[in-house]
Amino acid sequence: MPEANTFSDAGPDLWQCLGWQPNENQLSQLKELQALLRHWNSRVNLTRLVENEEFWIAQVFDSLWPLEKELRTPDLTRRCIDVGTGGGFPGLAVAIALPGTSLTLVDSVGRKTAAVESMANALGLGTRVDVRTERVEVTGQKRSCRGTFDLAMARAVATPPVVAEYLVPLLAHQGQALLYRGHWSNDDEANLKRALVPLKAKLADCKQINLPAGRGLRTLIRIESIAPCPKSYPRPVGLPNRLPLGNQADDKRS
C-alpha cells in the first residue's frame, strides 16, 4: 500500500513540492499562524481555508510558490506590499519565509486588519509588518507608499487590469508586481497587456503550476515598470473597478 502523503500536516512532501524548506523557527511560526487563524476565524470571518490541506496547500503553499526566486535569497532586504490581504495571505506567510523583507499589508475592512495586525504581533513579526486599513487607490497615491516597493502582490482581489492599476503605481524602480491567478486565458493576457500601456509597464513572465493533492491550477503573472507610472494612476476610489483600463477609449492618456 503506498505511503500517504504529508500535505495535510506540513510534512516533507509539501516542502519538496515547493522547493523550499522552513527552518525550525519558521515551521513553528507557520503552525502558530494556523492556530491564530482558527482563533480569529471564530470571531471574524477571515477565511474557510484553516484546516489540514486547505491551510497548508491553499494558504501556505499557494502564498509561497510564486516566490521561487525570492526564496533563494531570504535574507535580502526588500520592501513588499500585499494588497487586499484579507486574512493575512499571502503577506504573513511571506513575512515568515523571507526574514529580510518588510511587509505592508493593506485591506479596507477594519475588523480584518485588526485581526491580521494582532496575528503579526503574536508571531513576532510586528517590527517588519505594517498593516494599513484603507482602499488601495488611496495607498497608491500616498507619498510614503507610491513608488517604494520591490514587490507588490495581490491574490484573488479583482480582474487583472484592475489589479495592475492597483499595484504598478506602488513599484520602485525595477520592482515587480505579482498577480496570483487561477486559470489564465489568451483573452486575459490581451486585456492585461492593453491595461499596462497607460501604466507604463509590461508583462515580464507568466508561470503555471498544479497545486499538490489536486487543489487546482494556479498562474503567476509578473509585471514590471518600463517608466515611471503617471501620477493619475491609480484613479480615485472605485474607478479602476468600474472602468477597467484596456476597455476605455482614453487609455492612451498619460
Swiss-Prot record:
Record keywords: Cytoplasm, Methyltransferase, rRNA processing, S-adenosyl-L-methionine, Transferase
Tell me the residue numbers annotated for binding S-adenosyl-L-methionine: G84, F89, V136, E137, R155
Q: Where are the transmembrane segments?
A: none
| Xref: Gene3D superfamilies | Vaccinia Virus protein VP39 (3.40.50.150)
Q: Which PANTHER family match?
A: S-ADENOSYL-L-METHIONINE-DEPENDENT METHYLTRANSFERASES SUPERFAMILY PROTEIN (PTHR31760:SF0)
Record-stated family: Belongs to the methyltransferase superfamily. RNA methyltransferase RsmG family.
| Name of the protein this chain belongs to | Ribosomal RNA small subunit methyltransferase G
Tell me the organism's taxonomic lineage: Bacteria, Bacillati, Cyanobacteriota, Cyanophyceae, Synechococcales
Name the gene for this chain. rsmG
